[in-house]
Structures are given as structure tokens and as C-alpha cells.
């Protein structure tokens, strides 16, 4: 059985790139358009991993991470921020919320796959 990764990003083109990259690597992908949509999908089924953008409407990535970490069935899943933000203060905020890692856009597809393989052995 392949592992499922939930991706949250308000950019349709970015969701497409991330999903295609992960599907080509053998993962199942569920897409969410923002943090609120991601939480709704998490209430249906817990993924093995979450990849989220930082800046999204309705609920940003930091708040999404905080809320995901409060869910008993998602408390320990790996969460990776995939964002244009690269400032140390933002990374610290992400870590404090519960992010497992941080990838800065633009990214190389193989970089995303390597991170997924590392966090989902």
C-alpha cells in the first residue's frame, strides 16, 4: 500500500507540480486549497504526511500546523512547509508550531521526493 500525502497550497499550479512529483514517486496525494480545506480533509482520513504552503487565505500554514498537532490521529505525522518564505524567524515559527521540515520554493522535484522518502521510510 502506498503512503498518502496531503498537500495544502492556494496555487493550483503549485498543487499540480507537487502532486505530479509525488504521484510519479509512488505516493497517493490528496490536495487541499488552503488550511481550512486541509483540516476538513484531515477529519475524514489522516494522511501519512502533510506538505503545506505558509501563505494561504482562510487559514495559513502555521495555524494549520498548530491545529493538526492538536488532533490525536495526526499528532506525530511529518509536516513539511513548502513556501517562498526563507527567513529564519519564519522557520522558527514553523518549528515552534510543529513543522518537521522546510523546503523553499522554487524547489527541485527530486528534493521533494528525497524529503518524502526520508520522512516516510
Mark where each language-model region is.
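Charged docking surfaces used in two-component/phosphorelay signaling
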Residues: 16-24
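Acidic, metal-coordinating helix/loop segments flanking the phosphotransfer/catalytic sites
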Residues: 31-49, 92
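Receiver (REC) domain active-site loop signature in two-component systems and cognate sites
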Residues: 56
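His-Asp phosphorelay/catalytic-motif detector in bacterial-type signaling
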Residues: 46-48, 73-78
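C-terminal output helix
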Residues: 107-116
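Active-site residues of response regulator receiver
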Residues: 53, 83
Amino acid at each position: 500500500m502506498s503512503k498518502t500525502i496531503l498537500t495544502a497550497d492556494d496555487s493550483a499550479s503549485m498543487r499540480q507540480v507537487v502532486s505530479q512529483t509525488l504521484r510519479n514517486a509512488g505516493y497517493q496525494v490528496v490536495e487541499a486549497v488552503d488550511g481550512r480545506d486541509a483540516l476538513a480533509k484531515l477529519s475524514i482520513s489522516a494522511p501519512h504526511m502533510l506538505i503545506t504552503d505558509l501563505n494561504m487565505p482562510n487559514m495559513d500554514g502555521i495555524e494549520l500546523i498548530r491545529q493538526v498537532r492538536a488532533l490525536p490521529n495526526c499528532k506525530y505525522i511529518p509536516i513539511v512547509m513548502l513556501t517562498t518564505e526563507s527567513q529564519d524567524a519564519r522557520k522558527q515559527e514553523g518549528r515552534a508550531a510543529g513543522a518537521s521540515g522546510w523546503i523553499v520554493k522554487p524547489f527541485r522535484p527530486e528534493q521533494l521526493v528525497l524529503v518524502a522518502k526520508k520522512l516516510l521510510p
